[in-house]
């Protein structure tokens, strides 16, 4: 647990490093903190902060820089988001693809980092469902959409089922849940599982426990904008290996999509610092994200990707405002 003096010095160090990008020494920190402490006292506090893993000393400098752990403590307990005068912007109610592209561009232009938007997920409504036994504990689920599109999905279960049990489960789903999305079916099954025979309930839960990507038949689309902005960020431009890793992430998309999917399950803005998420193990990269809605339902996520040395207070405002603009534009689309 940090005392007040240590917190003030850590806060001053993080803010100075974010602003200037240079390791912060004890004399600079003494001036920045406003505390009447000797450089020797500040050095002792900095040594304690370093022992706690909150700051680190680059080999080429006597100053200190925040670690991902230090940034996290700063963001969670010390960051004050003051209302900043952002440019007046508006996203017009248009086709979803255009709203998404405009939002990604807006995020990158306001942040001067990379804007990212996960496109709205299509709700996978089914009209008819069938189960076919392929082998022991392995079954084919056939789902027919209202438009007549057919999706096939192989599932594996802990127990084995006879064809008569498969027919019984399919008949129950078709009679009670046809016309609903898979998400709605999942929610209904949670409430009604006690009323169903155990083996049938387990089979139906296995059938619908697939993500929207699999059932829609297409990968979630993710739109990036402003990737070249990272070329102007010293944290990346000074180390080509960092740039290559960042652009590999943007090209492959999978890890970014997983991170955005995690964010979609939370309320409000989320901040992922460095490699703490385990999904994007990149110590020099942070993501500030927030979900957006259509008619009150979360359908996607957007955010800003940049260096861990980013002005988090400003990024939070940019992401929060953009998520509200996108929600409004998509909800009021004619």
From Swiss-Prot:
Belongs to the HrcA family. The gene is hrcA. Negative regulator of class I heat shock genes (grpE-dnaK-dnaJ and groELS operons). Prevents heat-shock induction of these operons. Pfam families: HrcA (PF01628), HrcA_DNA-bdg (PF03444). Keywords: Repressor, Stress response, Transcription, Transcription regulation. GO terms for molecular function: DNA binding. The keyword Repressor applies. The keyword Transcription applies. This is Heat-inducible transcription repressor HrcA. PANTHER family: HEAT-INDUCIBLE TRANSCRIPTION REPRESSOR HRCA. GO terms for biological process: negative regulation of DNA-templated transcription. InterPro entries: GAF-like_dom_sf, HrcA, HrcA_C, WH-like_DNA-bd_sf, WH_DNA-bd_sf, WHTH_HrcA_DNA-bd, WHTH_transcript_rep_HrcA_IDD. It comes from the Bacteria.
